Amino acid sequence: MCKSLCRSVHGVSEANLTQVNNYHLLHRELAAEDPWRLDANAFEQERHSQMLRLSLSQGPITNALEVGCAAGAFTEKLAPYCKRLTVIDVVPRAIARTRQRMKESSHINWIVADVRQFSTQQLFDLIVVAEVLYYLEDVAAIRTAVHNLVSMLAPSGHMVFGSAIDANCRRWGHVAGAETVIAMLNETLIEVERLYCRGASVNEDCLLSRFQKSTT
């Protein structure tokens, strides 16, 4: 988790600078052996355990999409339960690290892409997007990403969303967090379950929610 504040310089908007800074920050963090301590930290392990439980709540997964893979800690847990899995991340290093970690898995499709522009003919029965959307530069960009993801969810499909709460995200310099995105998702999807994970540090919090798309 990080703070990324910036000002307008040489005619470049503050929002665009924030997006560029966030990208470089993610790239730099991913050079660490265990980025964000996703493999070693007890809070992250519990968060991933709950994310997996929510992901598997409807049984076997035919076609899943994971948005934002970091270094593959959650991908490694989810992949064995998916017949097909597409993993996208805007940072090439994230895809490269996770692909190396999962090199024995032939059923995964790896794509470097921005969640707002990613497009496919496929519909997914599960979409997982956690600790990703607050890196976008403004609420309009988050809404664009949400709309794009919902459009790729199959009828009766499920979305598992996770994020730090609004207050923490704003304290780190981001525009919005969990409550803002959950409100957007509730405009078009049905919220089925919500839970809150909290660790020992003030920075260790995550609101997780599972949504279902209507069949009509």
Swiss-Prot record:
Q: Keywords on this record? A: Methyltransferase, Nodulation, Plasmid, Transferase
| InterPro entries hit by this protein | NodS (IPR020944), SAM-dependent_MTases_sf (IPR029063), SAM-MeTfrase_NodS-like (IPR008715)
Instruction: Give the GO terms filed under biological process for this record.
Output: methylation; oligosaccharide biosynthetic process
Instruction: Tell me which CDD domains the record gives.
Output: AdoMet_MTases (cd02440)
GO-annotated molecular function: S-adenosylmethionine-dependent methyltransferase activity
Top EC group: transferase
Assigned EC number = 2.1.1.-
Q: Say if the entry is tagged with keyword Methyltransferase.
A: yes
Its domain of life reads: Bacteria
Question: Which residue ranges run through the membrane?
Answer: none
The UniProt function text for this chain reads: SAM-utilizing methyltransferase involved in nod factor synthesis.
Q: Which family does it belong to?
A: Belongs to the NodS family.
What this protein is called in its record is Nodulation protein S
Q: What is the lineage of its organism?
A: Bacteria, Pseudomonadati, Pseudomonadota, Alphaproteobacteria, Hyphomicrobiales
